[in-house]
Protein backbone atom coordinates (compact mmCIF):
# COMPACT_ATOMS: atom_id res chain seq x y z
CA UNK A 1 0.00 0.00 0.00
CA UNK A 2 1.31 3.46 -0.90
CA UNK A 3 1.96 6.18 1.64
CA UNK A 4 -0.85 8.29 0.18
CA UNK A 5 -3.34 5.46 0.69
CA UNK A 6 -2.17 4.87 4.23
CA UNK A 7 -2.47 8.57 4.98
CA UNK A 8 -5.99 8.70 3.52
CA UNK A 9 -7.08 5.78 5.68
CA UNK A 10 -5.49 7.28 8.77
CA UNK A 11 -7.09 10.69 8.14
CA UNK A 12 -10.53 9.21 7.60
CA UNK A 13 -10.22 7.25 10.85
CA UNK A 14 -8.91 10.11 12.99
CA UNK A 15 -10.75 13.15 11.72
CA UNK A 16 -14.56 13.17 11.51
CA UNK A 17 -15.90 14.58 8.28
CA UNK A 18 -13.25 13.13 5.97
CA UNK A 19 -14.99 10.60 3.78
CA UNK A 20 -14.19 8.57 0.69
CA UNK A 21 -17.13 9.31 -1.61
CA UNK A 22 -16.21 8.93 -5.32
CA UNK A 23 -18.75 9.46 -8.10
CA UNK A 24 -19.91 6.71 -10.45
CA UNK A 25 -17.63 7.98 -13.22
CA UNK A 26 -14.64 8.13 -10.87
CA UNK A 27 -15.23 4.58 -9.66
CA UNK A 28 -15.20 3.25 -13.23
CA UNK A 29 -12.79 5.53 -15.10
CA UNK A 30 -10.16 5.88 -12.37
CA UNK A 31 -10.32 3.11 -9.77
CA UNK A 32 -11.67 0.17 -11.77
CA UNK A 33 -9.64 1.04 -14.87
CA UNK A 34 -6.38 1.31 -12.92
CA UNK A 35 -7.15 -1.88 -10.99
CA UNK A 36 -7.55 -3.79 -14.25
CA UNK A 37 -4.36 -2.20 -15.64
CA UNK A 38 -2.44 -3.43 -12.58
CA UNK A 39 -1.79 -0.07 -10.90
CA UNK A 40 -2.32 -1.35 -7.37
CA UNK A 41 -0.85 1.65 -5.57
CA UNK A 42 -3.49 4.02 -6.98
CA UNK A 43 -6.41 1.89 -5.83
CA UNK A 44 -5.12 0.59 -2.50
CA UNK A 45 -7.95 2.26 -0.59
CA UNK A 46 -10.42 -0.27 -2.02
CA UNK A 47 -10.08 -3.89 -0.90
CA UNK A 48 -10.53 -6.85 -3.23
CA UNK A 49 -13.03 -9.22 -1.63
CA UNK A 50 -15.09 -12.20 -2.78
CA UNK A 51 -18.35 -10.54 -1.80
CA UNK A 52 -20.59 -13.56 -2.26
CA UNK A 53 -18.65 -15.56 0.33
CA UNK A 54 -19.74 -13.09 3.01
CA UNK A 55 -23.07 -11.95 4.36
CA UNK A 56 -23.60 -8.19 3.89
CA UNK A 57 -23.37 -7.42 7.61
CA UNK A 58 -19.91 -9.06 7.66
CA UNK A 59 -18.52 -7.06 4.73
CA UNK A 60 -17.84 -3.75 6.59
CA UNK A 61 -15.11 -5.54 8.54
CA UNK A 62 -13.38 -6.38 5.23
CA UNK A 63 -13.29 -2.76 4.06
CA UNK A 64 -10.08 -0.75 4.33
CA UNK A 65 -11.97 2.50 4.83
CA UNK A 66 -14.23 2.37 7.86
CA UNK A 67 -17.65 3.95 7.53
CA UNK A 68 -21.12 3.80 9.01
CA UNK A 69 -23.21 3.28 5.89
CA UNK A 70 -21.01 3.02 2.75
CA UNK A 71 -18.16 0.65 1.76
CA UNK A 72 -16.29 -0.16 -1.48
CA UNK A 73 -14.85 -3.41 -2.84
CA UNK A 74 -13.31 -4.92 -5.96
CA UNK A 75 -14.86 -8.26 -6.84
CA UNK A 76 -14.68 -10.73 -9.71
CA UNK A 77 -18.16 -11.27 -11.08
CA UNK A 78 -18.16 -15.03 -11.45
CA UNK A 79 -20.54 -17.10 -13.53
CA UNK A 80 -23.31 -19.10 -11.93
CA UNK A 81 -22.72 -21.94 -14.40
CA UNK A 82 -19.56 -22.62 -16.46
CA UNK A 83 -21.25 -21.81 -19.78
CA UNK A 84 -24.17 -19.74 -18.48
CA UNK A 85 -24.88 -16.02 -18.73
CA UNK A 86 -26.05 -15.44 -15.15
CA UNK A 87 -23.80 -14.14 -12.39
CA UNK A 88 -23.22 -15.94 -9.10
CA UNK A 89 -24.96 -13.86 -6.43
CA UNK A 90 -26.01 -16.33 -3.72
CA UNK A 91 -24.57 -16.43 -0.21
CA UNK A 92 -24.97 -18.97 2.57
CA UNK A 93 -27.98 -17.27 4.16
CA UNK A 94 -29.56 -15.42 1.25
CA UNK A 95 -29.08 -13.93 -2.20
CA UNK A 96 -28.57 -10.61 -3.95
CA UNK A 97 -31.52 -9.80 -6.20
CA UNK A 98 -31.06 -7.43 -9.14
CA UNK A 99 -33.66 -4.66 -9.30
CA UNK A 100 -34.40 -2.64 -12.40
CA UNK A 101 -32.40 -2.62 -15.61
CA UNK A 102 -28.70 -2.15 -16.11
CA UNK A 103 -28.03 1.57 -16.56
CA UNK A 104 -25.28 3.30 -18.52
CA UNK A 105 -22.74 5.54 -16.78
CA UNK A 106 -21.66 8.45 -18.99
CA UNK A 107 -18.78 10.89 -18.81
CA UNK A 108 -20.11 13.69 -20.96
CA UNK A 109 -21.49 12.00 -24.07
CA UNK A 110 -19.30 8.91 -23.75
CA UNK A 111 -20.48 5.72 -22.06
CA UNK A 112 -17.72 4.55 -19.72
CA UNK A 113 -19.53 1.68 -18.01
CA UNK A 114 -22.71 0.24 -16.58
CA UNK A 115 -24.37 0.26 -13.17
CA UNK A 116 -26.68 -2.34 -11.66
CA UNK A 117 -28.52 -2.18 -8.33
CA UNK A 118 -28.93 -5.26 -6.11
CA UNK A 119 -30.83 -5.76 -2.84
CA UNK A 120 -29.99 -8.51 -0.36
CA UNK A 121 -32.77 -10.95 0.57
CA UNK A 122 -32.65 -13.52 3.36
CA UNK A 123 -33.91 -17.01 2.51
CA UNK A 124 -34.84 -18.66 -0.75
CA UNK A 125 -36.32 -17.01 -3.81
CA UNK A 126 -39.09 -16.09 -4.31
CA UNK A 127 -39.96 -15.95 -0.59
CA UNK A 128 -36.85 -14.15 0.55
CA UNK A 129 -37.16 -11.29 3.01
CA UNK A 130 -35.83 -8.00 1.78
CA UNK A 131 -33.25 -6.23 3.95
CA UNK A 132 -31.74 -2.76 4.19
CA UNK A 133 -28.52 -3.82 2.44
CA UNK A 134 -28.14 -2.33 -1.06
CA UNK A 135 -25.24 -2.76 -3.47
CA UNK A 136 -24.39 -0.92 -6.70
CA UNK A 137 -22.26 -2.94 -9.11
CA UNK A 138 -20.10 -0.99 -11.61
CA UNK A 139 -18.56 -2.57 -14.69
CA UNK A 140 -16.47 -1.16 -17.55
CA UNK A 141 -18.37 -0.81 -20.83
CA UNK A 142 -17.95 -3.86 -23.05
CA UNK A 143 -16.33 -6.02 -20.37
CA UNK A 144 -17.06 -9.80 -20.36
CA UNK A 145 -19.53 -11.42 -17.99
CA UNK A 146 -16.89 -12.61 -15.51
CA UNK A 147 -14.87 -9.37 -15.53
CA UNK A 148 -13.69 -7.50 -12.45
CA UNK A 149 -16.21 -5.01 -11.04
CA UNK A 150 -16.23 -2.42 -8.28
CA UNK A 151 -19.09 -2.48 -5.77
CA UNK A 152 -20.54 0.21 -3.54
CA UNK A 153 -22.24 -1.34 -0.48
CA UNK A 154 -24.76 0.76 1.41
CA UNK A 155 -26.97 0.29 4.43
CA UNK A 156 -30.32 2.04 4.22
CA UNK A 157 -30.76 3.59 7.65
CA UNK A 158 -34.35 4.63 6.91
CA UNK A 159 -35.43 1.10 5.98
CA UNK A 160 -36.10 -0.15 9.54
CA UNK A 161 -37.84 3.07 10.62
CA UNK A 162 -40.12 3.15 7.57
CA UNK A 163 -40.98 -0.56 7.95
CA UNK A 164 -41.88 -0.09 11.62
CA UNK A 165 -44.06 2.92 10.86
CA UNK A 166 -45.95 1.11 8.10
CA UNK A 167 -46.54 -1.90 10.30
CA UNK A 168 -48.03 0.36 12.97
CA UNK A 169 -50.28 2.03 10.40
CA UNK A 170 -51.54 -1.36 9.22
CA UNK A 171 -50.04 -1.04 5.76
CA UNK A 172 -48.58 -4.15 4.15
CA UNK A 173 -46.35 -3.53 1.18
CA UNK A 174 -46.51 -5.66 -1.95
CA UNK A 175 -42.79 -6.33 -2.12
CA UNK A 176 -42.80 -7.95 1.33
CA UNK A 177 -40.47 -5.59 3.20
CA UNK A 178 -39.43 -7.16 6.49
CA UNK A 179 -37.11 -5.40 8.91
CA UNK A 180 -33.76 -7.16 9.15
CA UNK A 181 -32.81 -8.40 12.60
CA UNK A 182 -29.19 -8.63 11.58
CA UNK A 183 -26.38 -6.16 12.00
CA UNK A 184 -22.84 -6.12 13.13
CA UNK A 185 -23.54 -7.62 16.55
CA UNK A 186 -22.56 -11.22 17.22
CA UNK A 187 -25.91 -12.15 18.72
CA UNK A 188 -27.77 -11.16 15.56
CA UNK A 189 -25.28 -13.08 13.43
CA UNK A 190 -25.88 -16.26 15.42
CA UNK A 191 -29.63 -15.78 14.95
CA UNK A 192 -29.25 -15.75 11.16
CA UNK A 193 -26.91 -18.71 11.19
CA UNK A 194 -29.31 -20.83 13.27
CA UNK A 195 -32.60 -19.82 11.64
CA UNK A 196 -31.66 -19.29 7.99
CA UNK A 197 -29.05 -21.95 7.19
CA UNK A 198 -29.60 -22.66 3.50
CA UNK A 199 -27.41 -24.50 0.97
CA UNK A 200 -25.94 -22.29 -1.74
CA UNK A 201 -27.02 -24.62 -4.52
CA UNK A 202 -30.70 -24.47 -3.55
CA UNK A 203 -30.71 -20.69 -3.36
CA UNK A 204 -28.94 -20.32 -6.68
CA UNK A 205 -31.23 -22.79 -8.41
CA UNK A 206 -34.48 -21.33 -7.07
CA UNK A 207 -33.33 -17.78 -7.80
CA UNK A 208 -32.48 -18.78 -11.36
CA UNK A 209 -35.89 -20.37 -11.93
CA UNK A 210 -37.78 -17.37 -10.56
CA UNK A 211 -35.84 -14.84 -12.63
CA UNK A 212 -36.25 -16.86 -15.83
CA UNK A 213 -39.95 -17.37 -15.14
CA UNK A 214 -40.53 -13.68 -14.44
CA UNK A 215 -38.84 -12.71 -17.73
CA UNK A 216 -41.04 -15.06 -19.80
CA UNK A 217 -44.45 -14.63 -18.11
CA UNK A 218 -45.50 -11.68 -20.25
CA UNK A 219 -44.32 -13.30 -23.51
CA UNK A 220 -46.16 -16.57 -22.79
CA UNK A 221 -49.34 -14.74 -21.88
CA UNK A 222 -49.19 -12.72 -25.09
CA UNK A 223 -48.62 -15.85 -27.22
CA UNK A 224 -51.61 -17.59 -25.63
CA UNK A 225 -53.91 -14.65 -26.36
CA UNK A 226 -52.70 -14.48 -29.97
CA UNK A 227 -53.61 -18.13 -30.62
CA UNK A 228 -56.20 -18.49 -33.41
CA UNK A 229 -58.24 -21.18 -31.66
CA UNK A 230 -58.68 -19.18 -28.47
CA UNK A 231 -59.58 -16.10 -30.49
CA UNK A 232 -62.31 -18.06 -32.34
CA UNK A 233 -63.76 -19.51 -29.14
CA UNK A 234 -63.73 -16.13 -27.40
CA UNK A 235 -65.45 -14.28 -30.24
CA UNK A 236 -67.99 -17.06 -30.77
CA UNK A 237 -68.91 -17.02 -27.11
CA UNK A 238 -69.39 -13.27 -27.12
CA UNK A 239 -71.56 -13.40 -30.24
CA UNK A 240 -73.72 -16.26 -28.94
CA UNK A 241 -74.41 -14.37 -25.73
CA UNK A 242 -75.86 -11.54 -27.81
CA UNK A 243 -78.58 -13.88 -29.24
CA UNK A 244 -79.92 -15.38 -26.02
CA UNK A 245 -81.50 -13.63 -23.01
CA UNK A 246 -79.31 -13.39 -19.95
CA UNK A 247 -79.53 -12.04 -16.48
CA UNK A 248 -78.77 -8.28 -16.70
CA UNK A 249 -76.61 -8.39 -13.59
CA UNK A 250 -74.67 -11.39 -14.84
CA UNK A 251 -74.38 -9.81 -18.28
CA UNK A 252 -72.93 -6.62 -16.81
CA UNK A 253 -70.41 -8.69 -14.85
CA UNK A 254 -69.32 -10.61 -17.94
CA UNK A 255 -69.13 -7.40 -19.95
CA UNK A 256 -66.97 -5.66 -17.36
CA UNK A 257 -64.63 -8.66 -17.06
CA UNK A 258 -64.35 -8.96 -20.83
CA UNK A 259 -63.61 -5.26 -21.27
CA UNK A 260 -60.95 -5.33 -18.56
CA UNK A 261 -59.24 -8.33 -20.17
CA UNK A 262 -59.28 -6.64 -23.59
CA UNK A 263 -57.84 -3.44 -22.19
CA UNK A 264 -55.13 -5.36 -20.33
CA UNK A 265 -53.96 -7.54 -23.18
CA UNK A 266 -54.49 -4.97 -25.95
CA UNK A 267 -56.96 -7.03 -28.02
CA UNK A 268 -59.12 -4.89 -30.29
CA UNK A 269 -61.71 -6.47 -32.59
CA UNK A 270 -64.39 -4.88 -34.77
CA UNK A 271 -68.02 -5.96 -34.61
CA UNK A 272 -67.94 -7.22 -38.21
CA UNK A 273 -65.11 -9.62 -37.39
CA UNK A 274 -67.08 -10.88 -34.41
CA UNK A 275 -70.13 -11.72 -36.56
CA UNK A 276 -67.94 -13.37 -39.21
CA UNK A 277 -66.26 -15.54 -36.57
CA UNK A 278 -69.64 -16.52 -35.16
CA UNK A 279 -71.02 -17.43 -38.59
CA UNK A 280 -67.96 -19.56 -39.42
CA UNK A 281 -68.16 -21.20 -36.01
CA UNK A 282 -71.84 -22.10 -36.48
CA UNK A 283 -71.35 -23.42 -40.00
CA UNK A 284 -68.32 -25.50 -39.00
CA UNK A 285 -69.71 -27.03 -35.81
CA UNK A 286 -73.48 -27.30 -36.35
CA UNK A 287 -73.30 -28.35 -39.99
CA UNK A 288 -70.53 -30.79 -39.17
CA UNK A 289 -72.53 -32.57 -36.50
CA UNK A 290 -75.95 -32.58 -38.22
CA UNK A 291 -75.94 -33.12 -41.98
CA UNK A 292 -79.66 -32.25 -42.27
CA UNK A 293 -79.16 -28.74 -40.94
CA UNK A 294 -79.98 -25.98 -43.43
CA UNK A 295 -80.53 -22.24 -43.36
CA UNK A 296 -84.24 -21.45 -42.78
CA UNK A 297 -86.37 -20.65 -45.86
CA UNK A 298 -88.01 -17.23 -45.35
CA UNK A 299 -90.75 -18.03 -47.98
CA UNK A 300 -91.94 -21.19 -46.30
CA UNK A 301 -95.04 -20.28 -44.25
CA UNK A 302 -96.34 -22.62 -41.58
CA UNK A 303 -99.99 -23.65 -41.30
CA UNK A 304 -100.60 -21.63 -38.15
CA UNK A 305 -99.17 -18.56 -39.79
CA UNK A 306 -101.45 -18.90 -42.84
CA UNK A 307 -104.57 -19.17 -40.68
CA UNK A 308 -103.58 -16.15 -38.68
CA UNK A 309 -103.00 -14.22 -41.91
CA UNK A 310 -106.44 -15.13 -43.30
CA UNK A 311 -108.12 -13.97 -40.08
CA UNK A 312 -106.31 -10.67 -40.25
CA UNK A 313 -107.33 -10.13 -43.89
CA UNK A 314 -110.98 -10.96 -43.14
CA UNK A 315 -111.10 -8.61 -40.15
CA UNK A 316 -109.57 -5.80 -42.19
CA UNK A 317 -112.11 -6.33 -45.00
CA UNK A 318 -115.07 -6.19 -42.60
CA UNK A 319 -113.72 -3.03 -40.99
CA UNK A 320 -113.29 -1.30 -44.35
CA UNK A 321 -116.82 -2.32 -45.42
CA UNK A 322 -118.35 -0.84 -42.25
CA UNK A 323 -116.33 2.34 -42.68
CA UNK A 324 -117.39 2.69 -46.32
CA UNK A 325 -121.07 2.19 -45.41
CA UNK A 326 -120.83 4.88 -42.76
CA UNK A 327 -119.38 7.47 -45.13
CA UNK A 328 -121.92 6.52 -47.83
CA UNK A 329 -124.82 7.05 -45.41
CA UNK A 330 -123.50 10.48 -44.36
CA UNK A 331 -123.08 11.56 -47.98
CA UNK A 332 -126.68 10.57 -48.91
CA UNK A 333 -128.07 12.36 -45.85
CA UNK A 334 -126.44 15.67 -46.91
CA UNK A 335 -127.81 15.50 -50.43
From Swiss-Prot:
Sequence intervals crossing the membrane: 313-333
- Which GO terms fall under molecular function for this chain's record? DNA-binding transcription factor activity; sequence-specific DNA binding; transcription cis-regulatory region binding
Cross-referenced SUPFAM superfamilies = NAC domain
Q: What happens when the gene is disrupted?
A: In ntl8-1, no discernible phenotypic changes except slight differences in lateral root growth and flowering time, as well as reduced lateral root growth rate. Insensitive to high salt.
GO BP terms: namely: cellular response to salt stress; flower development; gibberellic acid mediated signaling pathway; membrane protein proteolysis; negative regulation of gibberellic acid mediated signaling pathway; photoperiodism, flowering; positive regulation of DNA-templated transcription; regulation of trichome morphogenesis
Q: Which residues bind DNA?
A: 112-162
Q: Where is the composition biased (Polar residues)?
A: 245-254
Keyword list, A-Z = Activator, Cell membrane, DNA-binding, Flowering, Gibberellin signaling pathway, Membrane, Nucleus, Stress response, Transcription, Transcription regulation, Transmembrane, Transmembrane helix
Chief localisation class = membrane
Give start and end of each NAC domain.
14-156
Query: One cellular component GO annotation, for this chain's record?
Result: nucleus
| Entry superkingdom | Eukaryota
Q: What tissue specificity does the UniProt entry give?
A: Expressed in seeds, leaves, roots and inflorescence. Expressed in roots, rosette leaves, cauline leaves, shoot apex, stems and flowers.
Q: What induces it?
A: By high salt stress. Repressed by gibberellic acid (GA), but induced by the GA biosynthetic inhibitor paclabutrazol (PAC). Accumulates transiently in seeds upon imbibition. Induced by drought stress.
- After translation, how is this protein modified? Proteolytically cleaved, probably by metalloprotease activity. This cleavage mediates a translocation from the plasma membrane to the nucleus.
Summarizing the function annotation, the protein's role is: Transcriptional activator activated by proteolytic cleavage through regulated intramembrane proteolysis (RIP), probably via metalloprotease activity. Regulates gibberellic acid-mediated salt-responsive repression of seed germination and flowering via FT, thus delaying seed germination under high salinity conditions.
Domain-level remarks: The NAC domain includes a DNA binding domain and a dimerization domain.
The protein in question is named: NAC domain-containing protein 40
Amino acid sequence: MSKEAEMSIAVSALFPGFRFSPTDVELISYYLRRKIDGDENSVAVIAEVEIYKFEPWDLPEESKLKSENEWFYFCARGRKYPHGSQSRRATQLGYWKATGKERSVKSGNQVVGTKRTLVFHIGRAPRGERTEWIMHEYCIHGAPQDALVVCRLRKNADFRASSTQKMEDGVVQDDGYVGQRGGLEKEDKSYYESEHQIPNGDIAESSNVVEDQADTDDDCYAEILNDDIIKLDEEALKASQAFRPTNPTHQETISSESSSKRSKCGIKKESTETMNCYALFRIKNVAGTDSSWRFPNPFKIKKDDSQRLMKNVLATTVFLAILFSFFWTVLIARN
